[in-house]
UniProtKB/Swiss-Prot annotation:
Its biological purpose: Part of the SNAPc complex required for the transcription of both RNA polymerase II and III small-nuclear RNA genes. Binds to the proximal sequence element (PSE), a non-TATA-box basal promoter element common to these 2 types of genes. Recruits TBP and BRF2 to the U6 snRNA TATA box.
Pfam families named among the record's database cross-references: SNAPC1
Cystine connections: none
Name the record gives this protein: snRNA-activating protein complex subunit 1
Chain intervals with Low complexity compositional bias: 1-15
Chain residue ranges for the region called Disordered: 1-22, 245-276, 290-389
Compositional bias of kind Basic and acidic residues: 245-262
Amino acid sequence: MGTPAGAGTRPTGAGTVEGVGIPPGLQTDYETLLSRFQEMDSVRFEDFTELWRSMKFATIFCGKMRNLKKNMFTKEALALAWRYFLPPHTFQIRVGALYLLYGLYNTQLCQPKQKIRVALKDWDEVIRFQQDLMNAQHFDAAFVFRKLRLDRAFHFTAMPKLLSCRMKKKVQQTEVTQKFKDPNDRVMKLITSDVLEEMLNVHDHYQNMKHAISADKSMPDRALSLVKEDFFENIKNIVLEHQEWHKERKNPSLKPKLKDGEENGEGSSEEPERCERAVSLAKIKAKAFSAVVPVSKSRRHRQSKLDSSDSDSGSGQVQGRAAKRKRTREPAGPAGRKRSSRSKGNAPNERKEEKSLHLSMPIITEEEEEDMGGVRKAEFTAPKRKRKC
């Protein structure tokens, strides 16, 4: 249905939804409700409820719909109302949006209820707005906000919208209605060209009256000089400076260039913003690498010495085992056997064999094992006890 023309018209509701997305007339209905609330020049909850009933906003969720479309419509309705609750809208529009969120949340037909999606980056602004309500003693609006928090109506998320793979790279920015927008330059709104012209006329008339009243027409009496003569010029200069500052703030590219000396002096101290991140990362990396403790040379030598000692101990164990086996072999042969001349001539060969035993594992044949076994049995056989008759 179209935009409500009168107070008794029914707003565009769930019956017009054909797919996912904002219904075509829902935003128009919201702006109509908020504009009428703005015209009342009030922030009272009772005034908003009167408009809510007259526009029949309670029937916004009525209509035959399946549960899936009902949930999607409720999410979109709450998300659209949430936009008017954030800056740069005026204080009165934000209060009206708070009442609108309260009405939509409590009249929805979803079970369980759909929550209001709130990005974490916006929550600080919301808390600041709640503090402003308390300071201004708008307790009805503060009570509505507290009731929503107690009902756990807010769903805190990282992003304002649910991200997916099909999201566009460039997110479309919503346009703010000019009549709902909070003026960012209140000075220029207060002091216009007409106001300056009127102030100039009053100041000239004041100076003329001082000359007319004083005895000396050329020099007015000092007792009559209650306002400085350059009062208007000072105000005019301040307004012009504010205009230039506001333009530079909006468009930094319009900022006048400095002189060569100043530019060179400040250019070395100020780095471009795009390089700040790279510089900070480089500092972090340098600090991380400098924290690594290098291994001292003494440890390396100590470690190599330990390795060499291990190898020496290993070779010493091999030598000890070979010596033990050599001792066990000596009694294996007959005690009265004499060495032949051939064995005497082969003495250097035996020494070489002993050296090779120190370096490699000894090889024991089966005959030697039998001989060693017999020797061990002979050594460790216990003497038999004689039986007593």
